[in-house]
């Protein structure tokens, strides 16, 4: 299977668009820096695939965030990305999590926030409750509320690989529900193992061999963290200088860590003085 690729496709005889994403390296980079319980590894894989599929529907340059929050043992799971399919993510949890825990078990009274931030234009935010049995169903609910277009998703993850498929009726073609339902029935026969092991062309042939499918050029998906020494310096400047200097006196340096990729940035006394004087550290060493 080609790793970390998203495919978009259309049906020549139906007003429906589709997407298929297969992830491995980017998924491993999201979960590899943290000791996530198996159920959280699976959830983050599904969330990563869902965010990639959502990102492919964007019609602008900018950022996307898909965030799950609640009052259960998992307080946060989030994937952030952009229109270039560059993604990163984290989760926060407390205590033991059962391998078969449901969304309700993990998040309690939870909700999903999808935030779209164009480089130009106004930010959009949609919120839906995590009151469906699966993450895929919750994302479908978001589309039903925000775009009011019939949409279906299938999400899979096993701690090693993640994958997903997406179908949606094209805008202004909502009366073609019969075609959409037929294609959903075909797509629902997909198995995780097929998405994890087969090339996209073979998957589409197995599902839609009686349909005329037009497959577009593949899009690479990657893990990309946006942390930097400069951003860490800017964060330090928001802290009271006396507090930072107390840490410096005790430890000899100030360490800033990234939650997403676990990168560490060290700042010594000269750096700290430069940050509060000029807003930037005096050197560029990590």
Curated annotation (Swiss-Prot):
GO terms for biological process: protein refolding. It comes from Shewanella oneidensis (strain ATCC 700550 / JCM 31522 / CIP 106686 / LMG 19005 / NCIMB 14063 / MR-1). Disulfide bonds join 225-227, 258-261. The lineage of its organism: Bacteria, Pseudomonadati, Pseudomonadota, Gammaproteobacteria, Alteromonadales. Under oxidizing conditions two disulfide bonds are formed involving the reactive cysteines. Under reducing conditions zinc is bound to the reactive cysteines and the protein is inactive. GO terms for molecular function: protein folding chaperone; unfolded protein binding. Its main location: cytoplasm. GO terms for cellular component: cytoplasm. Redox regulated molecular chaperone. Protects both thermally unfolding and oxidatively damaged proteins from irreversible aggregation. Plays an important role in the bacterial defense system toward oxidative stress. Keywords: Chaperone, Cytoplasm, Disulfide bond, Redox-active center, Zinc. This is 33 kDa chaperonin. HAMAP family: HslO (MF_00117). Belongs to the HSP33 family. Gene3D superfamilies: helix hairpin bin, Hsp33 domain, HSP33 redox switch-like. It is found in: Cytoplasm.
